[in-house]
């Protein structure tokens, strides 16, 4: 059983049990309709005193966990965090949290998760902490990554919400693990002579949809057939999930003059040990022939080599797509060979770029 007087202090927060003195704050939270308090929290103010007296402590009394308030330096309850599903015999527990809507995007969740997991390993014999998050909850995925957890897998449709089933990502942190976050590429904003390369986002869905549905894109790339707005939205979410896993990052290339969507460019298949990656892109139909794709690829390559210290960048283009091959060659890529049947049975020309190739 966890101690009744758990107290974890982080640089900006104090994690401590809820108590009767929290009644005014909790009543205000309940009245506001904010949903971040632990499971079983009252939905009407009349239930607040009883919940603070007993309900919120039932988990600790069961021996399976503990609910804690996240209090800031002024004593405001900015969130809640807890341990649950604790198996003392197996040495495992799970952490869950919620942050008040008015205090989100300030790093409180990551700070609290890091603080509580450090406390677990320092004061108990537990050896593993789990964290689960819906696959489409990008904010929670980022919290887990920043808190040093390892992405271990996806449980399909394991979470049931009001809008239906959701896939659930399982993260784990072991006592012996390092606490530094896994390496990922930042969602950096880059500029070239004519383009702004910014992280791919929902605002790029119309441009992505038109580009992905274009006949030439359909013929020369591996995008889904009959590309739709739903495919574009899924692509945006998938690319951010890949970034959080350390597998890649994606940009929208837009004109500096006017902001029109010109291309999507992404890095994928990152090998952190050897410092290699692959680049891919789709050019908007209206932007073809203007050199935008090559300009964007070269700008990203410079950043990847000079700032991130990678050593090799691969680009593959369909044998039947001479325009894409010209993009690679104008950007300084060197042709290495042909990967037979690599894209739906079609051959791909393999190019590579290393730092010494940069023009």
Put a short name on every predicted segment.
Residues 34-54, 68, 216-238, 249-251:
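Conserved GNAT-fold acetyl-CoA-binding loop/helix
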Residues 1-36, 67-220, 250-359:
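Acyl-donor (CoA/ACP) binding surface of acyl/acetyltransferases
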Residues 2, 54-58, 183-186, 238-240:
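Short, P/G- and charge-enriched loop/turn segments at secondary-structure junctions
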Residues 58-63, 149, 241-246:
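Short loop/turn motifs at secondary-structure junctions and domain boundaries
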Residues 29, 51, 55, 116, ...:
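A ubiquitous structural signal for well-ordered alpha-helices
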């Amino acid at each position: 059983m966890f101690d009744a007087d758990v107290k974890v202090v982080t640089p900006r927060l104090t994690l401590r049990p809820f108590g009767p003195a929290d009644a005014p704050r909790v009543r205000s939270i309940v009245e506001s309709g904010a949903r971040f308090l632990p499971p079983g929290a009252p939905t009407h103010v009349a239930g607040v005193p009883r919940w603070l007296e007993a309900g919120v402590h039932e988990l600790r009394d069961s021996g399976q966990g503990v609910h804690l308030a996240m209090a800031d330096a002024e004593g405001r309850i900015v969130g809640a965090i807890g341990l649950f599903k604790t198996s003392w015999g197996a040495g495992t527990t799970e952490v869950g949290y919620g942050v008040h809507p008015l205090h989100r995007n300030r790093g409180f969740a990551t700070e609290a998760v890091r603080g509580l997991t450090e406390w677990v390993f320092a004061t108990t014999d537990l050896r593993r902490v789990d964290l689960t998050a819906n696959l489409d909850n990008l904010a929670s995925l980022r919290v887990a990554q920043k808190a040093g957890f390892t992405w271990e897998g996806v449980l399909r449709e394991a979470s049931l919400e009001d809008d239906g089933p959701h896939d659930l990502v399982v993260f784990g942190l072991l006592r012996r693990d390092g606490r530094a976050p896994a390496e990922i590429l930042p969602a950096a904003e880059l500029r070239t002579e004519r383009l702004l390369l910014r992280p791919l986002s929902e605002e790029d869905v119309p441009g992505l949809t038109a580009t992905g549905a274009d006949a030439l894109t359909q013929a020369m790339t591996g995008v889904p057939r009959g590309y739709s707005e739903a495919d574009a939205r899924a692509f945006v979410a998938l690319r951010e999930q890949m970034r959080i896993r350390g597998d890649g990052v994606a940009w929208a290339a837009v004109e500096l003059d006017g902001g029109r969507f010109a291309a999507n460019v992404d890095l994928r298949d990152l090998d952190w040990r050897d410092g290699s990656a692959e680049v891919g892109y789709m050019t908007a139909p209206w932007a073809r022939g203007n050199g935008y794709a090559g300009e964007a690829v070269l700008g990203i390559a410079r950043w990847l080599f000079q700032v991130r210290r990678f050593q090799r960048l691969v680009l593959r283009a369909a044998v039947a797509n001479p325009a894409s091959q010209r993009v690679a060659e104008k950007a300084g890529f060197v042709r290495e060979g042909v990967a037979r049947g690599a894209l739906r049975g079609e051959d791909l020309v393999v190019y590579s770029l290393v730092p010494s190739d940069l023009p």
